[in-house]
A protein has these predicted regions:
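Membrane-interface extramembranous regions
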Residues: 1-123
């Protein structure tokens, strides 16, 4: 149980920190803003995605939130990360830009697996 707890909080904390950092860059970095424009997105999408990442990261971090709220956060992040990987590949970005979201998807999957294990242990 303790090992599962450590793995869950380590992966969830790392993932959430990266999503919060990413969201902050959406609001503060002219380079990130230019990249969204280059990929054909309107500015409102960048802001919406930044807000969604902040909310999702907080949902993952708040311990007393259980059930479908966390499931939706996990699903939303999964879709976002897969989409980011495909998008970076389709616009000809360096391969690292396509692989990075998949690495974080792996961290997200580990977090989800251990969240489920912790839920089963408390039932």
């Amino acid at each position: 149980m303790k090992k599962n707890n450590i793995i869950y909080w380590t992966t969830t904390g790392l993932f959430s920190a990266m999503m919060l950092f990413s969201a902050s860059m959406y609001f503060t970095s002219p380079e990130v803003q230019a990249n969204f424009t280059k990929m054909g997105f309107q500015d409102a999408f960048r802001i919406e995605l930044g807000i969604a990442k902040i909310i999702g990261a907080l949902v993952l971090l708040i311990p007393f939130l259980k059930g479908s709220v966390k499931e939706w956060a996990y699903a939303g992040f999964g879709i976002t990360l897969i989409s980011a990987s495909i998008l970076h590949a389709s616009v000809g970005d360096p391969i690292a830009n396509s692989i990075t979201p998949l690495i974080f998807l792996g961290i997200l999957v580990v977090s989800h697996i251990f969240w489920k294990k912790l839920l089963k242990a408390t039932v």
